[in-house]
Amino acid sequence: MDKKCFLDYLFYSLGKQNHDFYLQYSQEEGVKTKWRKYSEVCVDCENPKNKWFIENCNQRQILPFEVVLDLEEKERINPIVKELKERELIFYVYLTGSRGYHIHIFMKRELTEREKLNMIKQFNADTQKASGKCLISLEYAPHWKSNKIKDLVNGN
């Protein structure tokens, strides 16, 4: 999938235009851009600065109705996927391009940080991903450390 199409999917289809989110470009050497909102760069994507940013951004903010399970072990994926299917939740599993996997779970409403934390703990995943101030590697973009694409491996 094209990165811009995916960003549009997050904003329009999943977020229903109610949830703007931050994007950033980072490199391993510590080079980073300012956090910029989706609406700021994607509405005027023909502007050369915005076009460059969209083409190069590789991190995004976790959405208020999204829970991200950050896992290192591949063998943990299938039991979690089974449970998410039983709960009839919308989810996508990505190989992060770094060491592990991200399971993105999209809920029907916004969650508090505490609710996200409880769900993350239930699956014994990285609790740092409960914060609204946490950036994650952007789907279909090169990871800032490895330069490998964060790619979809499973979803419903």
PLM features per residue range, with description:
Residues 74-77, 112-116:
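Generic alpha-helical secondary structure
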Residues 114-124:
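Short amphipathic alpha-helices in soluble, non-transmembrane regions
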Residues 85-91, 122-125:
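Structural alpha-beta junctions
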Residues 74-88:
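Short amphipathic alpha-helix segments
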Residues 66-69, 81, 90-113, 135-139:
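Histidine-centered divalent-metal-coordination microenvironment in nucleic-acid enzymes
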Residues 72-73, 104-109, 152-156:
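Secondary-structure transition/turn motif
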Residues 1-67, 75-78, 125, 131-156:
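DNA replication initiation on ssDNA origins
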